[in-house]
Swiss-Prot record:
This is ABC transporter 7. The keyword Transport applies. It comes from Pyricularia oryzae (strain 70-15 / ATCC MYA-4617 / FGSC 8958). The chain crosses the membrane at residues 24-44, 127-147, 157-177, 190-210, 221-241, 336-356, 368-388, 496-516, 518-538, 602-622, 632-648, 1016-1036, 1111-1131, 1182-1202, 1204-1224, 1304-1324, 1327-1347. The lineage of its organism: Eukaryota, Fungi, Dikarya, Ascomycota, Pezizomycotina. Glycans are attached at N247, N489, N545, N956, N1097, N1277, N1396, N1411, N1541, N1552. Residues 81-93 have a biased composition (Acidic residues). Residues 700-949, 1392-1649 form the ABC transporter domain. Keywords: ATP-binding, Glycoprotein, Membrane, Nucleotide-binding, Repeat, Transmembrane, Transmembrane helix, Transport. InterPro entries: AAA+_ATPase (IPR003593), ABC1_TM_dom (IPR011527), ABC1_TM_sf (IPR036640), ABC_transporter-like_ATP-bd (IPR003439), ABC_transporter-like_CS (IPR017871), ABC_transporter_C-like (IPR050173), P-loop_NTPase (IPR027417).
Length: 1683
C-alpha cells in the first residue's frame, strides 16, 4: 500500500472494514472532500451575493397588486421568495408571454393580498443552538486529546486526527457565524445547509469506525474517544434533522382566512417521514374536514406563481417540451431519488441471500456479521422507502403545478378565443398533414408499431370533406372535458415519469448484472426475451394511444350532448322530449363504452403478456442452464434466479404501464395544444390602446369598414359566406344617446360586436376605448367615469352569485349610487318580492329569475359601473311597456347617464328614437340610413307611421309620465334622490331567510362510504352468479401462484439428497416500491402482479448433488402452470372489466334518466357545473378507475387468506406477531381513511366551481371582454384552481404519510423474520420455514396494499356516492299513467279552465298563484298581463305542470291534467318560452329533431314566422336551394338567407343567429306541431315591430288553436278575445280588452294602457276586435236560430 487512498479491494474482510479503508477514506479523504466542497460553495455564493447587492434589486416573478374590495387594512404583500429558484435565469425571456392581449390577461397583476405573520420560534430553539455549540466544542476537544495522547493512535492516526480537528474547527466557525450574524445585514446565506450536510456526512463516516471500535478495539482510550465522538456526532446529526430547516425566520401567509401551509416549518426528518402531516391526519380523525380547515398551498405552488414562472420559460414548438423544460430541475431531482430507491431495492434480497448462506454454513463467518445483515434488512429498506416517497412527493408537486398550468392556460385561451359562430372541431382527430409519408422508413416504423397505423374509421370519406375551416372551434363540452379530463390525464402522468426514465431503467440494469453473476451465459436468453418484449410494449402503447383517442373523442361528444341537454332542459321538458334526447345521449354513450371495451381488451391482453414474460425468461434461462450447459440447477441458483426474475418483472411492468399511460397523456396533451393553437380574437389589435383618430380626437366610430363572422375565408357548404357587415362608415356621438334600429336579422347586434372588436375585420378601422384592461384605466376625478365600456347583451348574462354581486361586478360599493341604480332599473319591487332581497342567489345564467329581471340586472350592472360608454343590445325587449317607459326615462335618459355615451340597439322605435341624438338604421348587413333622429324619422326609414307622428308633434314632446308608475316604484318613493336606505335593498329580510341564499352550495357526505353506495355499484356489475364466477377465477389465479412456488421447491430438491432450504422472499424488495397512484394513472395489474411475486420462492444450498433429474419434465410442467396463471390473470381482468362496463352503462343510464326527469326546481338551484361534474369526472372515475382497484383489493384479500392458511399450518407461532402487526395496520388505516376520504370528497366538490366558472365564462366571454374585466376572471380562476389543488395535495401528503409508516411496519416484519431464521437454525425444516417466512413477509405487504387500495377504493366510490346523490333527487310525476290516458286526439277543442288553483315553488314558500279561477273557451286568444311577480310565468308553468297544484285543478277539454301522465300532457300542448332554445346542428334538426315533418311543412312554418320572405322562392323537396353566387369583393356582396337551406348550420345555443332569429325559429318549431293549445311567453320580444305585426297576423289566422300569450307589448294582445290581469298571484280582471279599457281610471289594464303612451292605438285595435267579435257572435246566433 502506497500513499493515501491506495487500499486494496475488497475493503470488507470477514466481519469488518479494513483498517486502511477506515484510515484513508473514512478519516482523511472523504471528510476532506466534504470540507473542500463546502468552502468552494461558500466562496462562490458569497461572491455572487455581494455582486447582487451592488445591483438594483430585481422584481419578483409576480408582483402582487390590490384585489379590489378584498384588501384589508394592514395586509402585506405575498411576495415570499422561495428558498430555491424554480427557474434557471437562462430560461427566462424578459416578460414575454406575461402580458396577453395588451396586458388584459397579465399574470403579473393577478396575485392577491395576504397577511404575513412570523412563525413561532420553537421553545427549544435557543437551547438547541447552545447544545450545538457545546457538542462541536466537545468534538474539537476529542481530537485535541487524540492528538496529544499516543494511546489513541490506533483509531486516530496523525493525519486523520489533523483532518478531523480541522473539520470541527471549521464547523465551529460556521455555527458561530450562524448564531451571531443570522439576523443582520451581514448574514452569510445557506450556512445551515453546510453545517447540516457536514454533520450528516461525518455521522455516516463514523458508523463503520464506531462498529469496528466496538468489535475490534485497538485500545481502551481509543474506544472511549470513538464512543464519545460517535455520540456527539449523532447528537449533532439528529439535532440537524429534527430542528426547523434554515437559519432564518419562516414567514406564514394568511390569505382570506385560510390556514397557511406548514410544510416549510418541517425539519428534515419531518419532511422525509411526512411527520408534518400528523396534524392533518389527527384533525381529520377527530372531525370531518371542511375547506376552511385545509391548509393553503405554499406560495411557490400557487397557480399565479407557477403560471408566471412557466410563461417566462422560452417557448418551444411543442407543449410537452415546454413543460419538460420548465420542470427539468424537479424531474432531475425526482430521478436522483428514484435511482437511489432503485439501487436499494435489491439490498434486502442480497442480504437475505447472505443470511441464508450463513444458515447453510454457520461456521463460515462470526455471529456478529449475520446480526449486522439482519439489522441492515430494515435499514436498507427504510432508505429505499425514503427515496421512493421523496420521488413520489416531488412528482405530486409537479402534478399540481402541471394541472395549474394547463387549466390556467385553457381558461386564458377561453378568454382570448374568437366569438364562436363556426362549426365544432374534433380535438385530437388526425389531420391529413399528420399522416406519415410512404416509403421504407414508414414501413419500418409500422412494423415496429411506431408509425401512425390507426386509420380513421371514416377515412374513406376524407376526400369528400373540404379543408378544415379556420373558424372551427372546440365546443363548450369539449373545453370542459379538456379542463376536467385531459388536464388530469397529463398531470397524473407527470407524477410518475421517474418510473419511466429513472426507476425502471435502474432496476433493469442492476437486475441484469446480478442475473449474469448468478447464471452466467444462461441469462442471455432472458435478456433476449426482454429485448423482444420492447416492440410488443410499444405496440401496446400505440394500441392504448389509438383507443384513448377514440375514448376522448366519444367522451367529448357525449359530454357536449349532455351539456346541451342540461342547458336546454326546460324546452326539452316542455316538449316532453326527455326520452328522445336521452336516447340521443345514450347512442353517444354506447360509442364511448365500445371504445372503453376496446381499451380494456388491449389492457387485458397486455396483462396476460406481462404475466407471461417472466415465465418465458425463467423457462429459456433454465432450459439453457440445464439442457444446453448441462449444469445442475441447485436450489441456491434456482431460487436466487427466480427472485431476480421477479425483481426484473417489476420494472418491466412499470415500463409497460408507463408507456401506455404516456401514450394516453400524449393524446390529451395534443388535444390541449390543438385547442391552445386555435385562432384568437383580434379585438385587442382592432381597438388598440386608445380610440383617438388622426386628428387626436377621441371618437367612437367604424370607418370604411367591413366585417365577417369567423375567419376571412369562411365558406359554407352551399358556397355562401358567413354573415357580413359591408360598407360600414359611421361615427357615434360621444356623451349622447345613439340608437341602432332595423328589422330582425339586419345586423344590429353584429354592429355592436364589430364595435367591440368581436367580428373579423376585413378592412377599415374601429375606434372604441376597449383595448385596455379596466384595472389599468383611471377614472376622471371630476366625473368619476373611466374611458371604458360596459355592455348589456341581448341575452342577459349573469354569474352564479347573488343579485348584489352581479350588479356591483367587483366595483366598489357606493350605497347611494347602488340605490339610485336599483330604482332607475325598476328593481325595487323585485327585491321586495324575492325572499332574500338582493342577497338572493340567481343561479347559473340567472335561472331563478324571469327574463325581464335578468335583463334589468344586466342593465343595472352596466349603469352602476364607472364606464363612460355603454353598449345596450335590445335591453328593453324583455320588460313590459310601462317598465320600459320607466327605465328609458329614469335610467337611459336619467341623471345616472349624464356625460355618458349610450349606443343602444332597440325595436322599441316609438319610445326610443324620438328622444335619441343619433340614429343608425341597418338592413341586411349595411347601414341604410344614419343621422339625427328627426332626419332619419322624417326620411321614412323607420316606417311611415312614426314619420307621420313625428311631423305632427314637436320633438321635445314626450308621453312618458313624470311620476313613477305604481307597478315599478310602489312604496319606495318617486325620486332617484331618495336616500332612506331601506335595508331590504342590500340585506335579506331576516336572518332565517338569509340561510336560503346558500342553497346552491354543493354538499358532501361525511364518514365512511356507506354500504348502499357499494351495493349500488356491485349490484350494477352483475347478479350473484357474476360474483361466483369472479371468485372462482380469482381463486384459480392465486392457486396457480402457490402451485408454481411448490413445484420449483420440488424440482430444486431433486438435485440434493439432503437440503437445508430457506427461501429468498421475492417480496422482501417490494415494500412500497410500487407506491400507489390513482388507478387511472398506474394500473392495478402492477400491484396484483406484485402480489404474485411476493408469495415467496425458496432457495436451497445443496449438500449432495443428484445429477439424475429430468429437467425437461419439470420445465414443461412449470411452463404449463405459468401459462395457466397468465390465462387466469387475463380472464380475471376481462371478467371484472366486463362487469365494470355493465355497471358504467347502467349507472349512466339511470343518472341521465333521473336528472332529465327531475323537477324544474332542481335545475333552478343546481348549477350546471355541479351536474356536469357528475357526468364528466365522476362518470369517468366509474368508467375507468373503480374496476382496476377492485381487482387489486380482491387479489390482496386472497393473498392474505392464503398467507394465513400457510403460516397457520407451518409456523403457528408467527400468528402472534401477525396479530400485533395487523392491529398496527388497522390503526394506521383508521387514521388515514378518516382524513383521506374527506380530502378526496373536498377535492371532488371543489371541481364544481371550476366547471361552473368555465361554463359561465364560455357563455359570457363577450361581456367579460367588453368590460375589460378578463384579469379579475383570471384571478378568480386561479383562486378556484388553488381551491381544488389544496385538498388534492394534502390528500397525497396523507398518502405518503401512510406509505412510509406501512413500509416501516413491513421492515419490522423483515427484521423479525431474519431474527427468527437465525434463532431457528436446526430447530425446524429450513425449506418449510423459508416458505412460511416468505409468505409472512408477503402477509405484511398484502395488508399494506389492502389498506392502500381500500382507501383508494373509498376515494373512487366517492364518485359513485356523488352520482347516487343525484339518483335520489325528487322526480316529476310519471310520464304516462296507463289508467288515466287521455283520448288520442286530445285536446280536440282546446278549452282551458282553472278552478280555485293554488300553487307554490316549494311547500315552505308563499303561494305564487292563489285561488285562480277562470275559463278559456276553445279557440280563444287570451293575453296575460301584470307587473313583475304577479304570477304570469307561474301560470304558464302550471299549465305544463312544472308547478304542481297545492289546491284546485286545471282542466283541458274537461280532463284534469293533474291525473294524466306528463308526456301525454306536454306532447299535446306547446309553449314558446321567452328565452329561445336552440341546439347544435342544422335548421332542420332544430325545427324537427326527430324527423316527424316533411321539408314542405318546415318551409311553410319558416314562411309563417317571416324567416323566409314572401318574395323568396322556397326550394322543392327534390332540388337543392338555388342561391345566387356571392361576389368575391365585399363591396358588391350581400348576405344570403340561410333559412332557405335547411342544412344550414346552427352553432351551440344558436350563437350564429341573432336573438330575434332564434325566437322566430323557436316559434316556427311550435307552429309545426299545429297545437290545439299554444302558450307564448313573450315569444316575440326581440323581434322588430313590423315583423311582430306580421307574425301576429299569422297567429290570428290559427283559428283552431287556443292561444295564451304572456305579453309585455300591449299592442300584441289589444285585439285578443280576452285579457287576464294578474296581481300577487290573483286574478284582478278578466274580460275583453275593450271592456277593460272602458272601466275608467280604476281599471288595472286601463292604467297599463295609459302608461304605455299608446292608449289611442290600443283602444282603436281593441274596439275594432270587439266589434268584429260581436258581429261574429250575432252571425252565429242567427245561424243557430235558422231552421
Amino acid at each position: 500500500m502506497g500513499g493515501v487512498g491506495q487500499c486494496q479491494w475488497p475493503v470488507w474482510q470477514v466481519d469488518d472494514l479494513t483498517p486502511c479503508f477506515q484510515h484513508d477514506y473514512l478519516r482523511i479523504l472523504l471528510p476532506a472532500v466534504v470540507i473542500g466542497l463546502s468552502v468552494l460553495n461558500l466562496g462562490f455564493r458569497s461572491a455572487r451575493h455581494a455582486a447582487s447587492r451592488s445591483k438594483s434589486p430585481s422584481t419578483h416573478a409576480y408582483a402582487p397588486v390590490s384585489n379590489g374590495d378584498n384588501s384589508r387594512p394592514g395586509a402585506h404583500r405575498t411576495d415570499i421568495s422561495p428558498d430555491d429558484d424554480a427557474i434557471a435565469q437562462d430560461d427566462e425571456d424578459d416578460d414575454e408571454g406575461l402580458a396577453i392581449g395588451g396586458g388584459r390577461l397579465a399574470l403579473v397583476k393577478t396575485a392577491t393580498k395576504g397577511s404575513i405573520v412570523q412563525a413561532d420560534t420553537p421553545p427549544a430553539q435557543t437551547l438547541s443552538v447552545v447544545v450545538e455549540e457545546l457538542a462541536i466544542a466537545g468534538l474539537v476537544a476529542v481530537y485535541v486529546i487524540a492528538l496529544l495522547s499516543p494511546k489513541a493512535h490506533g483509531s486516530y492516526t496523525l493525519t486523520g486526527t489533523i483532518i478531523g480537528l480541522t473539520t470541527w474547527v471549521y464547523v465551529l466557525v460556521l455555527a458561530t457565524l450562524r448564531l451571531f450574524l443570522g439576523n443582520t445585514q451581514w448574514r452569510v446565506p445557506h450556512l445551515w445547509n453546510h453545517t447540516a450536510a457536514i454533520y450528516s456526512c461525518q455521522w455516516l463516516f463514523l458508523i463503520g469506525i464506531f462498529r469496528s471500535a466496538m468489535v475490534h478495539p485497538s485500545s481502551k482510550l481509543a474506544q472511549i474517544l470513538v464512543i464519545v465522538e460517535f455520540a456527539l456526532t449523532s447528537l449533532l446529526f439528529f439535532m440537524a434533522i429534527t430542528t426547523r430547516k434554515g437559519n432564518k425566520t419562516v414567514l406564514l401567509e394568511w390569505e382570506d382566512g385560510i390556514p397557511p401551509a406548514r410544510e416549510n416549518l418541517a425539519s428534515l426528518f419531518s419532511s422525509f417521514t411526512f411527520s408534518w402531516v400528523d396534524q392533518i391526519v389527527w384533525q381529520g380523525y377527530k372531525e370531518p374536514f371542511e375547506m376552511g380547515k385545509v391548509w393553503n398551498l405554499l406560495p411557490k405552488d400557487k397557480a399565479a406563481t407557477v403560471l408566471s414562472h412557466y410563461r417566462r420559460v422560452k417557448k418551444t414548438t411543442k407543449l410537452y417540451w415546454h413543460l419538460l423544460r420548465y420542470f427539468k430541475g424537479d424531474l432531475l431531482s425526482q430521478a436522483g431519488w428514484a435511482v437511489m430507491s432503485g439501487m436499494f431495492t435489491f439490498a434486502p434480497t442480497m442480504l437475505l441471500k447472505a443470511i441464508l448462506e450463513y444458515v447453510e454454513e454457520p461456521e463460515s463467518a462470526p455471529r456478529s456479521v449475520v446480526w449486522l445483515y439482519v439489522i441492515l434488512l430494515p435499514v436498507t429498506d427504510i432508505i429505499r422507502s425514503l427515496g421512493d416517497n421523496r420521488a413520489l412527493w416531488i412528482g405530486r408537486k409537479i402534478c399540481i403545478n402541471v394541472r395549474a398550468i394547463l387549466v390556467g392556460e385553457i381558461y386564458a385561451k377561453a378568454l382570448r378565443r374568437k366569438a364562436a359562430t363556426g362549426k365544432d372541431t374534433v380535438l385530437g382527430s388526425e389531420k391529413k398533414e399528420d399522416k406519415p409519408k410512404g416509403g421504407f422508413i414508414s414501413k419500418i416504423k409500422k412494423m415496429l408499431c411506431l408509425g401512425d397505423n390507426d386509420e380513421s374509421e371514416d377515412g374513406k370519406d376524407g376526400d369528400k370533406d373540404k379543408e378544415d375551416s379556420s373558424d372551427e372551434q372546440a365546443n363548450h363540452g369539449t373545453i370542459i372535458n379538456l379542463m376536467s379530463v385531459d388536464s388530469f390525464n397529463v398531470s397524473e402522468v407527470t407524477s410518475y415519469l421517474h418510473f419511466l426514465f429513472a426507476s425502471a431503467p435502474t432496476q433493469l440494469l442492476v437486475s441484469v448484472v446480478l442475473l449474469y453473476q448468478v447464471l452466467g451465459m444462461s441469462a442471455i436468453p432472458g435478456f433476449v426475451v426482454m429485448v423482444l418484449l420492447l416492440p410488443v410494449n410499444i405496440g401496446f402503447g400505440r394500441a392504448f394511444n389509438s383507443t384513448q383517442k377514440k375514448i376522448m373523442a366519444c367522451s367529448d361528444k357525449r359530454i357536449h350532448s349532455t351539456n346541451e341537454v342540461l342547458q336546454n332542459i326546460r324546452i326539452i321538458k316542455y316538449f316532453a322530449w326527455e326520452h328522445r334526447f336521452s336516447e340521443s345521449v345514450d347512442e353517444k354513450r354506447k360509442a364511448e363504452l365500445k371504445a372503453l371495451r376496446a381499451r380494456y381488451m388491449v389492457w387485458a391482453c397486455a396483462v396476460a403478456v406481462w404475466n407471461t414474460v417472466p415465465l418465458l425468461i425463467t423457462f429459456f434461462s433454465f432450459l439453457m442452464y440445464t439442457t444446453v450447459e448441462k449444469r445442475p440447477l441447485h436450489p441456491s441458483i434456482a431460487f436466487t434466479s427466480i427472485s431476480l426474475f421477479m425483481l426484473l418483472r417489476h420494472p418491466l411492468d412499470q415500463l409497460g404501464d408507463m408507456l401506455a399511460h404516456v401514450q394516453e397523456a400524449k393524446v390529451s396533451i395534443d388535444r390541449i395544444e390543438e385547442f391552445l393553437s386555435e385562432e384568437e380574437t383580434d379585438k385587442f389589435i382592432q381597438l388598440g390602446e386608445d380610440n383617438v383618430n388622426e386628428e387626436g380626437t377621441r371618437i367612437i366610430a367604424l370607418k370604411d369598414a367591413a366585417f365577417i363572422w369567423g375567419g376571412k375565408d369562411i365558406i359554407a357548404a352551399d358556397g355562401s359566406q358567413a354573415f357580413r357587415l359591408l360598407d360600414i362608415d359611421t361615427e357615434f356621438m360621444i356623451g349622447k344617446l345613439n340608437v341602432i334600429a332595423g328589422p330582425t336579422g339586419s345586423g344590429k347586434t353584429s354592429l355592436l360586436m364589430a364595435l367591440l372588436g368581436e367580428m373579423t375585420l376585413l378592412k377599415g378601422r374601429v375606434y372604441l376605448p376597449g383595448g385596455r384592461s379596466r384595472e389599468d384605466v383611471r377614472p376622471d376625478p371630476e366625473t368619476g367615469l373611466a374611458e371604458t365600456c360596459a355592455y348589456v347583451a341581448q341575452q342577459a348574462w349573469l354569474v352564479n352569485a347573488n343579485i348584489k354581486d352581479n350588479i356591483l361586478f367587483s366595483a366598489r360599493f357606493d350605497e347611494k349610487r347602488y340605490r339610485d341604480v336599483i330604482v332607475a332599473c325598476a328593481l325595487e319591487r323585485d327585491l321586495e318580492i324575492l325572499d332574500n332581497g338582493d342577497e338572493t342567489l340567481v343561479g347559473e345564467k340567472g335561472i331563478t329569475l324571469s327574463g325581464g329581471q335578468k335583463q334589468r340586472i344586466s342593465l343595472a350592472r352596466a349603469v352602476y359601473s364607472n364606464s363612460k360608454h355603454l353598449l345596450l343590445d335590445d335591453c328593453l325587449s324583455a320588460v313590459d311597456s310601462h317598465t320600459a317607459q320607466w327605465i328609458f326615462n329614469n335610467c337611459i335618459r336619467g341623471p345616472l347617464m349624464k356625460d355618458r355615451t349610450c349606443i343602444m340597439v332597440t325595436h322599441n322605435i316609438p319610445l326610443c328614437v324620438p328622444h335619441s341624438d343619433f340614429v343608425v338604421v341597418m338592413d341586411n348587413g349595411r347601414i341604410t340610413h344614419q343621422g339625427r333622429a328627426l332626419e332619419v324619422i322624417t326620411s321614412g326609414a323607420l316606417g311611415e307611421e312614426i314619420a307621420q307622428k313625428a311631423k305632427s308633434e314637436t320633438p321635445n314632446i314626450s308621453r312618458i309620465p313624470s311620476r313613477v308608475p305604481s307597478s315599478v316604484g310602489e312604496g319606495s318613493g318617486n325620486t332617484l334622490l331618495d336616500t332612506d336606505g331601506d335595508d331590504h335593498l342590500s340585506k335579506p329580510k331576516n336572518a332565517k331567510k338569509a340561510k336560503k341564499a346558500e342553497a346552491m352550495e354543493e354538499t358532501k357526505a361525511t364518514g365512511a362510504v356507506k354500504w348502499p353506495v357499494m351495493k349500488l355499484y356491485l349490484a350494477s356489475m352483475g347478479s350473484w352468479w357474476f360474483w361466483v364466477v369472479a371468485g372462482c377465477i380469482f381463486i384459480s389465479q392465486q392457486a396457480s401462484d402457490v402451485v408454481s412456488n411448490l413445484w420449483i421447491k420440488q424440482w430444486a430438491s431433486q438435485y440434493t439428497t439432503e437440503v437445508s432450504s430457506v427461501p429468498i422472499s421475492t417480496s422482501s424488495h417490494m415494500y412500497g416500491t410500487q407506491s400507489f397512484a390513482p388507478t387511472y394513472m398506474v394500473p392495478v395489474q402492477t400491484y396484483v402482479k406484485d402480489q404474485l411475486a411476493r408469495n415467496g420462492n425458496a432457495t436451497a444450498l445443496d449438500i449432495v448433488v443428484n445429477s439424475e433429474v429430468n429437467a425437461q419434465y419439470y420445465l414443461v410442467v412449470l411452463a404449463i402452470i405459468g401459462l395457466a396463471g397468465s390465462l387466469t390473470a387475463f380472464l380475471r381482468d376481462l371478467w371484472i372489466f366486463f362487469g365494470s362496463l355493465t355497471a358504467s352503462a347502467k349507472i349512466h343510464t339511470r343518472l341521465l334518466n333521473t336528472v332529465t326527469r327531475a323537477k324544474f326546481r332542481f335545475f333552478d338551484v343546481t348549477p350546471l357545473g355541479q351536474m356536469m361534474n357528475r357526468f364528466s369526472k365522476d362518470m369517468e372515475a366509474v368508467d375507468q378507475e373503480v374496476a382496476p382497484i377492485a381487482i387489486g383489493i380482491l387479489s390482496c384479500a386472497l393473498g392474505i387468506t392464503v398467507t394465513v392458511v400457510l403460516i397457520a399450518s407451518i409456523t403457528p407461532g408467527f400468528l402472534i406477531a401477525a396479530v400485533f402487526i395487523t392491529i398496527a395496520y388497522v390503526l394506521l388505516a383508521k387514521f388515514y381513511l378518516a382524513s383521506s376520504r374527506d380530502l378526496k370528497r373536498l377535492e371532488s366538490v371543489q371541481r364544481s366551481p371550476l366547471f361552473q366558472q368555465f361554463g359561465e365564462t364560455l357563455s359570457g366571454v363577450t361581456t367579460i371582454r367588453a368590460y375589460g374585466d378578463e384579469r379579475r376572471f383570471v384571478r378568480d380562476n386561479l383562486t378556484r384552481i388553488n381551491g381544488q389543488l389544496r385538498p388534492m395535495i394534502y390528500l397525497w401528503a396523507t398518502n405518503r404519510w401512510l406509505a412510509f409508516r406501512t413500509d416501516l411496519l413491513g421492515d419490522f416484519v423483515s427484521f423479525f423474520a431474519g431474527v427468527f431464521v437465525i434463532l431457528s437454525i436446526g430447530v425446524i425444516d429450513a425449506g418449510w420455514a423459508g416458505i412460511s417466512l416468505s409468505y409472512a413477509i408477503g402477509f405484511a405487504e398484502n395488508i399494506l396494499w389492502l389498506v392502500r387500495l381500500y382507501s383508494i377504493n373509498e376515494q373512487n366510490m366517492n364518485a359513485v356516492e356523488r352520482i347516487k346523490e343525484y339518483l335520489e333527487v325528487e322526480q316529476e310525476a310519471a310520464p304516462i299513467c296507463e289508467k288515466n290516458r287521455p283520448p288520442q286526439n286530445w285536446p280536440a277543442q282546446g278549452s282551458v279552465e282553472f278552478i280555485n288553483y293554488t300553487t307554490s315553488y316549494r311547500k315552505e314558500l308563499d303561494p305564487v298563484l292563489r285561488n285562480v279561477t277562470f275559463k278559456i273557451s276553445p279557440q280563444e286568444k287570451v293575453g296575460i298581463v301584470g307587473r313583475t311577480g304577479a304570477g304570469k310565468s307561474s301560470l304558464a308553468l302550471a299549465i305544463f305542470r312544472a308547478l304542481e297544484a297545492d289546491g284546485g285543478k286545471i282542466l283541458i277539454d274537461g280532463i284534469d291534467i293533474g291525473l294524466i301522465g306528463l308526456r301525454d300532457l306536454r306532447e299535446a300542448i306547446t309553449i314558446v318560452p321567452q328565452e329561445p332554445t336552440l341546439f347544435t346542428g342544422t335548421i332542420r334538426s332544430n325545427l324537427d329533431p326527430f324527423h316527424l315533418f316533411t321539408d314542405e311543412q318546415i318551409y311553410k312554418s319558416l314562411q309563417r314566422v317571416q324567416l323566409i320572405g314572401p318574395d323568396e322562392t322556397i326550394p322543392t323537396a327534390d332540388a337543392s336551394p338555388v342561391l345566387p353566387a356571392s361576389p368575391t369583393t365585399p363591396g358588391g356582396a350581400s348576405n344570403k338567407n340561410i333559412f332557405l337551406n335547411l342544412s344550414s348550420k346552427v352553432s351551440e345555443s344558436g350563437s350564429n343567429l341573432s336573438q330575434g332569429q332564434r325566437q322566430l325559429l323557436c316559434l316556427a318549431r311550435a307552429l309545426l306541431k299545429e297545437p290545439r293549445v299554444l302558450v307564448m311567453d313573450e315569444a316575440t320580444a326581440s323581434i322588430d315591430y313590423a315583423t311582430d305585426s306580421k307574425i301576429q297576423d299569422t297567429i290570428r289566422e290559427m283559428k283552431d288553436t287556443t292561444i295564451i300569450t304572456i305579453a309585455h307589448r300591449l299592442q300584441t294582445i289589444a285585439d285578443y278575445d280576452k285579457v287576464l290581469v294578474l296581481d300577487k298571484g290573483e286574478v284582478v280582471e278578466y274580460a275583453h280588452p275593450w271592456e277593460l279599457m272602458r272601466k275608467g281610471e280604476g281599471g288595472s289594464f286601463k292604467s297599463m294602457c295609459d302608461m304605455s303612451g299608446d292608449t289611442e292605438l290600443l283602444a282603436k285595435a281593441a274596439k275594432k276586435a270587439f266589434d268584429a267579435k260581436k258581429l261574429i257572435d250575432v252571425d252565429d246566433e242567427a245561424a243557430d236560430a235558422a231552421p
